[in-house]
């Protein structure tokens, strides 16, 4: 990745960074909850974003 990024690339990377976090614990405690973990977690080495 270049040090000088275009603004659109930087926006995409910022969104991906925000999405790449674990599930909040209070969501797991809700009634009738079936979500156990964030299935869309991304590791920077294993899975690339294709941008």
From Swiss-Prot:
Span list, region Disordered: 1-22
One Gene Ontology term, aspect cellular component: cytosol
Basic residues bias (residue ranges): 7-20
InterPro entries referenced in this protein's UniProt entry, alphabetically: Ribosomal_eL39 (IPR000077), Ribosomal_eL39_CS (IPR020083), Ribosomal_eL39_dom_sf (IPR023626)
Gene3D superfamilies in the record: Ribosomal protein L39e
Top-level lineage group: Eukaryota
GO molecular function: structural constituent of ribosome
Pfam family for this entry, one: Ribosomal_L39
Keyword Cell division: no
Biological process according to GO: cytoplasmic translation
Subcellular location per the Swiss-Prot or TrEMBL entry: Cytoplasm
Subunit structure, as described in the record: Component of the large ribosomal subunit (LSU). Mature yeast ribosomes consist of a small (40S) and a large (60S) subunit. The 40S small subunit contains 1 molecule of ribosomal RNA (18S rRNA) and 33 different proteins (encoded by 57 genes). The large 60S subunit contains 3 rRNA molecules (25S, 5.8S and 5S rRNA) and 46 different proteins (encoded by 81 genes). eL39 interacts with YIH1.
Functional summary from the UniProt entry: Component of the ribosome, a large ribonucleoprotein complex responsible for the synthesis of proteins in the cell. The small ribosomal subunit (SSU) binds messenger RNAs (mRNAs) and translates the encoded message by selecting cognate aminoacyl-transfer RNA (tRNA) molecules. The large subunit (LSU) contains the ribosomal catalytic site termed the peptidyl transferase center (PTC), which catalyzes the formation of peptide bonds, thereby polymerizing the amino acids delivered by tRNAs into a polypeptide chain.
Family stated for the protein in its record: Belongs to the eukaryotic ribosomal protein eL39 family.
Full protein name: Large ribosomal subunit protein eL39
């Amino acid at each position: 990745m270049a040090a000088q990024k275009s603004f659109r690339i930087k926006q995409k990377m910022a969104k991906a960074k925000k999405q790449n976090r674990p599930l909040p614990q209070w969501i797991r405690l809700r009634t009738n909850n079936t979500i156990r973990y964030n299935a869309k977690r991304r590791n920077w080495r294993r899975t690339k974003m294709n941008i």
